[in-house]
Amino acid sequence: MKVRNLMLSLAFIATGCHGFAATKGDKHMRGEVKLDGSSTVFPIAEAAAEEFQKLYPRVRVTVGLSGTGGGMKKFGSGDIDIATASRKMKPAETKRIQEAKIEYTELPLASDGISVVVNPSNTWATQLTMAQLKQIWQPGSSIKTWKDINPAWPQEKIKLYGPGPDSGTFDFFTEHVMGTARLSRSDYVASEDDNVMVTGVSKDRFAMAYLGYAYYEENKKLMNVVALAKDKDAVIPSPKTIEDGTYPLARPLVVYVNNKSAQQKPEVKLFVTFLMQNVGALAKEVGYIPLKDAVYTETLRKFEAATGGPTQQSH
């Protein structure tokens, strides 16, 4: 996603037109907030970091991009304050983090729909069934050309792009398409950077990829989205179909906050408060589907209860 271009629209938020809440704290506060993890959550986290640093220029907020799995490893090692994730924490990750005696709070940010995309000149693959998607991506797949999927389609090799194994998108996609997480063919171009997939699909008429909805929305002139059919009619991802769950690959986006970091570092607690007060507007601006306001209010209450009460603010 072109995050820098995105910040032009985020400047509009800062005027208050989208209910942007300028959380008040010590303008001279110093410190560092470290986030790492999901490439899907990255646009929200990066936008929040930039807006927060306009208010608190002496606080350094770093946002890493090592994939959900990579972020969880760093979170479990105590290397970061916040892990960003495009899926729920796995049992093995929970166990490792608990063994490290790290207490945390899970905070929902928004909803997303993993989008299957093709080149704009692809006029044949307008929709796929979930069964066909499984045939394409299963280990040892016999699908090599478009004609292998449908006899009426071109006998041209499919160039596949997708997230790498550290990605939460990879985990969620394989679990919901294959029925087993991390089960996938390996002969595809794998990357933790969604822009690699955008570029690959936009330049190859016979390419296919899957990525977060915000990356499709930001680059829709460079690719077509494929409608997916699970039981009956094929459905394309949109704010409505993702929110109501009719799109087959709708999923949650979350962050995990180290409670000790929030308790001992006021800049971390203030950043999380700022994030949760503004994430609805930020999510919408970057192309994801915001949750209900009541969810954010309850989430912030839960976070404050876990970390010693409301953020202390000064004017």
Question: What is each stretch, according to the model?
Answer:
Residues 8-16:
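Bacterial N-terminal signal peptides
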Residues 17-315:
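Flexible loop/hinge segments at secondary-structure junctions
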